[in-house]
């Protein structure tokens, strides 16, 4: 009986040592640490190239606002209504005007234009200009738009090609 108790006691001690180590690996893995470094959180702020660094909390807030306001059509950085135009970095950079910076994305959310910049699509695409089309946009503040833009630009740095890559990643 004593040897059984000793064996159980040793096993329990081993588990007590192992559990915190496993929790630490799950909560603070090297991939997680790299994911939120300053370089990852830094994105172009305007067309001139001025950089802006967001905090992890700001990006998480931007993600929540994005998922609530835009996620119905743009989950994972795709565009459900037009798979040719997503939110991946290359597509944003090739738009006219380029939408690969915070200011340009905020401007687009306020008054969207076609991909070539030739005409307004505010009557078709949710925006601040015509919040009747999609009421979720109605009460968004400029700060929330800025945080969503930050999230859109940071997401591909964290998710890689899965952001804007389409349904093969879901």
Swiss-Prot record:
Binds 1 heme c group covalently per subunit. It is found in: Cellular thylakoid membrane. It holds the Pfam family Cytochrom_C550. This is Photosystem II extrinsic protein V. The gene is psbV. Transmembrane segments: none annotated. Belongs to the cytochrome c family. PsbV subfamily. It comes from the Bacteria. It comes from Parasynechococcus marenigrum (strain WH8102). One of its GO terms (molecular function) is iron ion binding.
């Amino acid at each position: 009986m004593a040897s059984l108790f000793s064996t159980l006691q040793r096993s329990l001690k081993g588990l007590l040592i192992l559990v915190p180590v496993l929790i630490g690996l799950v909560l603070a893995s090297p991939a997680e640490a790299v994911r939120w470094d300053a370089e990852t959180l830094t994105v172009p702020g305007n067309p001139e190239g001025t950089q802006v660094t967001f905090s992890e909390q700001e990006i998480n807030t931007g993600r929540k606002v994005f998922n609530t306001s835009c996620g119905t059509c743009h989950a994972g950085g795709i565009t459900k209504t037009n798979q040719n135009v997503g939110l991946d970095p290359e597509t944003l950079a090739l738009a006219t005007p380029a939408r690969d910076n915070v200011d340009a994305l905020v401007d687009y959310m306020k008054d969207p234009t076609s991909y070539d910049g030739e005409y307004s699509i505010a009557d078709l695409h949710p925006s601040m200009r015509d919040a009747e089309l999609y009421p979720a946009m109605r009460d968004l503040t400029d700060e929330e738009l800025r945080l969503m833009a930050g999230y859109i630009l940071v997401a591909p740095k964290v998710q890689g090609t899965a952001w804007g890559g389409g349904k093969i990643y879901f």
